[in-house]
Every structure is written in C-alpha cells, then in structure tokens.
Amino acid sequence: MASARESTPRYLTLIGATLACSALALGAAQAQTEPAEPEAPAETAAADAAGQTEGQRGAAEAAAALAAGEADEPVILEAPAPDARRVYIQDPAHFAAITQQFVIDGSTGRILGMTDGGFLPHPVAAEDGSFFAQASTVFERIARGKRTDYVEVFDPVTFLPIADIELPDAPRFLVGTYQWMNALTPDNKNLLFYQFSPAPAVGVVDLEGKTFDRMLDVPDCYHIFPASPTVFYMNCRDGSLARVDFADGETKVTNTEVFHTEDELLINHPAFSLRSGRLVWPTYTGKIFQADLTAEGATFRAPIEALTEAERADDWRPGGWQQTAYHRQSDRIYLLVDQRDEWKHKAASRFVVVLNAETGERINKIELGHEIDSINVSQDAEPLLYALSAGTQTLHIYDAATGEELRSVDQLGRGPQIITTHDMDS
C-alpha cells in the first residue's frame, strides 16, 4: 500500500487538491449567492453593507448582480474628475522592486484605483488635477539586471498612462522617497528630478513633448522647490538656499542669505506650496523656518516655535516620515509631534500641533489616537487632515478644524509613506 501511494504521480495529487479546493470554493460561493429567500441585488448590498470594507461591499454587490443575471461582462470603470480632496498614497513597500500607488476619494474613503510602479517611485500631482505622474525605476529581471529609469504620466480619470518617458543613463537618485526630491514646474510643463551621482544635477523632463530634455549642473544642494517655470530653489549645506535659473538654455546659480545655523538641524521633509511659494521647514526640536520663494528671490520670515518651552523640556519633538503639512488658504501649519528621545525623529507620532503660520500662535493640538508616520491636508476651504500609518497600512481621515476622525482606509500595501494632493481650489 505504501509503495502504491508513493507511486502516485505528483501532478495527479496536485490536480486532485485543486479540484477539491475548487469544489469547496464553489460550495461557499453558492451558499453566498443562492440564499433560501433571494433578495434584490440592491437590498442584499444594503443588508450586508454594515461592517464591511469598501472592497467587501463592492464584491457583494457584484456577486448579487451576477446571481440575478444582471451583469455577466467585465466593466472597466472611470474615476470621477479629481477635486481638492482626492489623495494619493504612495507605498514604497520597504524598498521592494514592485510598488503601488493608491488613489482615494478623501470625502468618502473610497479607493478609486491603483497604479503600479517600480523601485522607489516618486509621485507628483498637477495642482490643477490634469494628471498625476511618477519617476520610477525598473530592472530587467525584477530586482536585478539592466536598470531603466523613466517618468510615467497618468490620466486622472482612466488611470491609463498618457506618457512614458525613458531617462538616459539611469540618472535618478535612489533614496527613501522624499516628497520634494522631484517636482513639477508651476506650469506643469516640466518635471524636475534629482541626480546624486556621478555629480549633483537636476534633470528636466519635457512633459508636453514627452521627452527627456537635459541635465542641469547644480551645487551640492538638495530638494527642489520650483518658483516659476524656469527657477527653482535647493537647500545647501551652508544654511542657504541655492536659486537656480535655467531659462534660455543656461544655468545660473546664486545663493540666498544663510537662514539657519549649523546646529539648527532641518528635518528631511519640509512642506511647500507650489501655488503660493511658501516653504515651511521645521528643525528636529520643532523650530519652524519659513520662506516665500519667487522667481526674483527668497524672503525669509521670523522663525516660530511649534512646541512650548515646557513641552521641549518634557522631550516633545517632531517625528515621523512626512511630518509637515501647510494649508495655503488658512495659512496654517500642521506638525506631527510626540514625546521621544533625541534622534528618534523618524519614529511615528500620535499628535499634531496646528499653528497660525503668520503669528506662530497654536490653534490646536490634535490627539490622533494612532501611531502616524505621515500627514498632509486637502487644499479646500474646509480641509481634511490625512494621517497615514505605515505600520498598519491605514489612512486615517480627520476634520482638520476639530480633529475629529471621520473615516479610515486600510489595506494600503505594505509600507505606505507619501501623501500627495492637488491644490486646485481658489
């Protein structure tokens, strides 16, 4: 008997197991879609809606429609036109070679769709909602082999690619995704990306012509803050900003005044409003520097403190990944904070302080109720506060004025970190 069992071909064993699993799945499906007293599809969906995720509700509605004979052909839906509350969640997936970006309606918490990306993709979104895009990297054999860097531009309604632009010589700086290492120019005509090696440079991608344009030699400075179609700023090691003008085919670099000292260490994720030119940059201790960037120059504002002297003495500090958000219409700053040891600035936080950017006055201190890594705000008159947990892969959505949690969206990949929005309201 033992020899007979051992001689059973492995493929027959696998086929038998597969058929058994299929039969079990079919029985479960019949149990779900053939109730003793059938209900109309709409009634079934309504009855099952409580306690279900968006995906579960959609699956139940589709199953009911199929059972009623109302739908038997696949349908590819289109997303509604973008608004100021649409939010993009980029999941670098802990340095995985294949990644995802989730597109969510912040008003409802509904996932509208997803796009795929490669290694350490960098997302951008046109402020007017006309497109969203990413700079990304893929390899010939998934995680090895020939490397290709490219920029992919997506239609915001169909999510289909409308441009796929290869970057010569694989020039992208592959680093944990920092929000402002890539940027769109204010006219949406060019995407700017950073090159680290063999020498510092900024690449220009012509989105209208759907082609790579050129590399601009820049000093050893970081981040890209566009102030006009041909002028952007970068942060330099001496505490100044480099103003880079690349009009007329030439690159001219000048430096602003030094705006912070050597021991005033800036976090890696400032907030920047492409529409107003406001740069908001906290330090590790919660001191916030601000500048207004224009094509002509930079104007620095008096620094403000996000935390009180008592809070700093009690080890309150900023922390997280994307720690800072700025709301243009209300001129308010949002900063992730918590009690933490020094040099723990990348650890998640449970609180957000809300500040008047003009006066430095604290407006609110919101207890989030979750360990949060990244924040952003919708750029409408009554903004939502988006708070993202990489650990639980969940986006929590709050009323930015009251701090009340309104809804949440879970199952967002493996380690989501970056939150991007459109600033399309007046």
Curated annotation (Swiss-Prot):
Segments spanning the bilayer are none
Q: Does the keyword Glycoprotein apply?
A: no
* Keywords in alphabetical order: Disulfide bond, Electron transport, Oxidoreductase, Periplasm, Signal, Transport
Q: Work out whether the entry's keyword set contains Transport.
A: yes
Q: Under the cellular component aspect of Gene Ontology, which terms does the record hold?
A: periplasmic space
| Principal localisation | periplasm
The EC code for this enzyme is 1.4.9.1
Places the protein is found: Periplasm
MF annotations from Gene Ontology: aliphatic amine dehydrogenase activity; methylamine dehydrogenase (amicyanin) activity
- Signal peptide as annotated in the record: 1-31
Name the InterPro entries for this protein: MeN_DH_Hvc, Metamine_DH_Hvc, Quino_amine_DH_bsu, WD40/YVTN_repeat-like_dom_sf
Q: Name one GO biological process term.
A: methylamine metabolic process
Q: Which reaction does it catalyse?
A: 2 oxidized [amicyanin] + methylamine + H2O = 2 reduced [amicyanin] + formaldehyde + NH4(+) + 2 H(+)
| Positions of disulphide bridges | 221-236
Annotated segments matching region Disordered: 32-64
**Pfam families, A to Z:** Me-amine-dh_H (PF06433)
- Summarize the protein's role: Methylamine dehydrogenase carries out the oxidation of methylamine. Electrons are passed from methylamine dehydrogenase to amicyanin.
Tell me the subunit arrangement.
Answer: Tetramer of two light and two heavy chains.
Q: Write out the similarity annotation.
A: Belongs to the aromatic amine dehydrogenase heavy chain family.
Entry protein name: Methylamine dehydrogenase heavy chain
Organism expressing this protein natively: Paracoccus versutus
What is the primary gene name for this protein?
A: mauB
